[in-house]
């Protein structure tokens, strides 16, 4: 059973929520994107290598 004290009141004062900076999602996203961007940069750089 839910009571009215559990629900936020519309228009009432709300407490600011502090979220952690590093989360599992943040680590997973950056563990994939950082090497991907590095790899794409390496591929782009290799296009300018002259024989």
Curated annotation (Swiss-Prot):
Superkingdom, taxonomy of origin: Bacteria
Chief place where the protein resides: membrane
Annotated TM spans: 26-42
Cofactor(s) it depends on: heme b
Record keywords, A-Z: Cell inner membrane, Cell membrane, Electron transport, Heme, Iron, Membrane, Metal-binding, Photosynthesis, Photosystem II, Transmembrane, Transmembrane helix, Transport
Cofactor note: With its partner (PsbE) binds heme. PSII binds additional chlorophylls, carotenoids and specific lipids.
InterPro entries assigned: PSII_cyt_b559_bsu, PSII_cyt_b559_CS, PSII_cyt_b559_N
GO biological process, one term: photosynthetic electron transport chain
Topology relative to the membrane: Single-pass membrane protein
An example Gene Ontology CC term for this record: photosystem II reaction center
Compartmental location: Cell inner membrane
Function: This b-type cytochrome is tightly associated with the reaction center of photosystem II (PSII). PSII is a light-driven water:plastoquinone oxidoreductase that uses light energy to abstract electrons from H(2)O, generating O(2) and a proton gradient subsequently used for ATP formation. It consists of a core antenna complex that captures photons, and an electron transfer chain that converts photonic excitation into a charge separation.
Oligomer and partners: Heterodimer of an alpha subunit and a beta subunit. PSII is composed of 1 copy each of membrane proteins PsbA, PsbB, PsbC, PsbD, PsbE, PsbF, PsbH, PsbI, PsbJ, PsbK, PsbL, PsbM, PsbT, PsbX, Psb30/Ycf12, peripheral proteins PsbO, CyanoQ (PsbQ), PsbU, PsbV and a large number of cofactors. It forms dimeric complexes.
UniProt name for this protein: Cytochrome b559 subunit beta
The organism of origin for this protein: Gloeobacter violaceus (strain ATCC 29082 / PCC 7421)
Lineage of the species this protein comes from: Bacteria, Bacillati, Cyanobacteriota, Cyanophyceae, Gloeobacterales
Gene name of the encoded protein: psbF
């Amino acid at each position: 059973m839910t009571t009215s004290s559990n629900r936020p009141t519309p228009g009432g004062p709300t407490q600011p929520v502090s979220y952690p900076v590093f989360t599992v999602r943040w680590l997973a996203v950056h563990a994939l994107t950082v090497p991907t961007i590095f790899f794409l940069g390496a591929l782009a750089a290799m296009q300018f290598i002259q024989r």
